[in-house]
Regions:
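A sequence/structural signal for flexible, mid-protein segments enriched
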Residues: 19-318
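Sec-dependent N-terminal signal peptides
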Residues: 4-13
Length: 318
């Protein structure tokens, strides 16, 4: 009984402590930090967003309206980007694969910001195949895998990200008639129960990866399907059926991304996924700075070359 009373008092103290307002607390002053952000896309005009990172009491960054933004291609000056409002600066240069791009930002009263990146090539997807019953989801349902074959160069450090739009529909036949159907569709950005060596090497289920351990010029990536989806069933009851016809489609999108884009996305993952030292109940979280390749400032200067392969249609009897 005595032990119960002590535990009750401790709980009461903990609750009252959590509800007590901290008086005379002042947030430390945060000097606005110049920030350069840009993700150049192959085939589109170059651009850059210049802002100032603010303190915790600011919801949005403050736009920089008076910057001089100079753009370089392969080490040669190309143009001065024009300000279009809200800190957005745009140019007329079209981003092209395998070219080096650099950006210099001059802001009165601050050190000059500088960043550079290389535009990757678009990935070449050579084949897409569906492997039935590759794994099972949390509810014990059989899930297919999407096998994506693509070309790469093992002699260069290359980086990729992918997403898969898919729809799977099952039609249950009885006496030659469809009596029930089920389906699910959506977009996949991760792989469940990951057993692909490249994804395992990344230590993440996200479809963000490098060719670090690939030794051949072509690789087949195995993505065990799972996605945020809309599902339905035309009937809520179950009867005997003669056969099932599976229909649907799979559309793979894959992008080549610059090294800076890859490391930034990786740092985002680390920020969003708690580690072993994180205890949200106690307010404990591991400090982490997002990756930045901007000299004298914050932000990321990256490049992406997206592609979408042909749609694969499914029409098979199981």
């Amino acid at each position: 009984m005595k032990k119960t009373i002590i535990l009750f008092l401790l709980a009461a103290l903990a609750i009252s402590g959590c509800r007590k307002q901290v008086s005379d607390y002042k947030r430390p002053y945060f000097d606005p930090q110049p920030t350069l952000n840009a993700v150049l896309q192959e085939g589109l005009p170059v651009w850059a967003q210049v802002t100032f990172a603010q303190g915790l009491d600011s919801v949005h960054p403050s736009a920089c309206e008076n910057a001089e933004v100079l753009f370089y291609v392969d080490g040669q000056f190309a143009e001065r980007l024009q300000h279009e409002g809200d800190g957005l600066y745009v140019g007329e240069t079209t981003a092209e694969a395998l070219h080096e791009y650099a950006c210099k930002v001059i802001i009165p009263g601050y050190d000059t910001l500088f960043a550079q990146t290389q535009m990757p090539e678009k990935p070449v997807v050579t084949h897409v195949e569906i492997m039935e019953n590759a794994t099972m989801d949390e509810e014990g349902n059989a899930c297919p895998a999407i096998m994506i074959s693509f070309n790469t160069n093992p002699n260069k450090n290359l980086y990729y990200q992918s997403s898969i739009d898919a729809a799977f529909f099952s039609y249950f036949y009885y006496n030659g008639q469809v009596y029930n159907s089920t389906g699910a569709k959506g977009t996949m950005h991760t792989s469940i129960n990951t057993d692909d060596p490249v994804l395992l090497n990344e230590g993440s289920s996200q479809l963000l990866f490098s060719n670090e351990i690939i030794t051949d010029t072509n690789y087949t990536l195995k993505v065990n399907s799972t996605f945020n989806y809309h599902s339905y069933s035309s009937h809520g009851y179950t009867v005997e059926y003669d056969s099932i016809v599976r229909k649907g489609y799979v559309e793979v999108s894959m992008s080549g991304i610059s090294e800076s884009g890859y490391h930034y996305r990786k740092s985002q993952e680390a920020y969003q996924e708690p580690d072993a030292y994180t205890n949200l109940f106690l307010g404990v979280i591991t400090p982490l700075n997002l990756y930045s390749n901007v000299g004298n400032g914050r932000g990321v200067f990256a490049a992406i070359a997206p592609m979408t392969c042909d749609t694969v249609f499914i029409h098979s009897k199981l």
